[in-house]
Amino acid sequence: MHPRLSPTVRALNAAAAATLLLGLAAPLGAQGAVDPNVAPRAAELERIGERQLGTEMLGRYLAVAQSDGRAWFLLARFYRLDARDWHRSGHRTSPDAELYLALSDVAIEEAVKLEVDSAPLYGALVAVDRALVTIEEQGWSHLAGSDVLPPLPPMVLELGRNLVANCPSGGVILAGSELEGVAVWYGVMGPGGRSDLLPVRPDLYAIDGRYRSQTARALGVSDSLGIRPALAAASAARAVCLTPNADSTLVPDEQPRIERLVRIIGPGDVPANAGLGFTQLVLDQETGSSVWSRDVLSVYGVASRRNPLLCRSLASVAGVLPGGACRP
């Protein structure tokens, strides 16, 4: 569990948290048989707007069938969605995001133990979400050197380092997808990361007053500004960098300069040691070991279509880049 969780949440071990907060009617008992139909039924409930019923179904089921990794993973996803809804509601609902994310963490740890392919990356997403709660409560400066991040799949970790490598010192960086977002977060906040950069979530800035207030303070702008004027004001003094899939309409109407994977608005020079690495990407193409290969390749493909010079560095994987990138 995360070291900054409240004492009450830290005191709950996995079994107690599941029993108390999933609303299980039955105590944890003997291991039951895995039913492959439960997770799809719960997912369908969520699809039709009955996530709470799906959560209760999974809770009762996992109390007796604790070896179903897919069900644990789906339960983690449901609790993370509950935390997202808490932000969107203006923090007016109960429980709060901290508790939902603690429960998501419990569930994803079980999914990791059961070797669900996507679980490690999802655990990283939950860790980022916990950090966002800390930002809202205590500000960006509280994060410096204080986070212990769970492991990230090596190819995604490499992607994050590549995405942040060419953003000028002191810049702001915007991601365009969850994959890019978690990769950038690790590239900034992880060991040896670009801690001089500020990874901003435009979607959260638009809907969450607490996040907007703390992030506007870090940007040095008024929190009365929307995300686009806030970034325009910030870009007068610092670079604003966009990952390959980031929305270009969020930044001022000027032609960005392209530096390898990122587009840049505003001042600042690219760090002198800003090399890119593709060791994990190439290794994965040889072994086929990562379920995230297609998504990571898609990011590089988008960047290569915008910046054909990248194709030289990506020559060894050019044949598998999507959308015709790097092909004659």
Language model features: what each stretch is:
Residues 2-16:
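Bacterial N-terminal signal peptides that target proteins for export
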Residues 13-25:
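Bacterial N-terminal signal peptides
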Residues 26-30:
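Sec/Tat signal peptide C-region and signal peptidase I cleavage site
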Residues 31-170, 182, 187-328:
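ER/secretory pathway lumenal C-terminal domains and tails of membrane proteins involved
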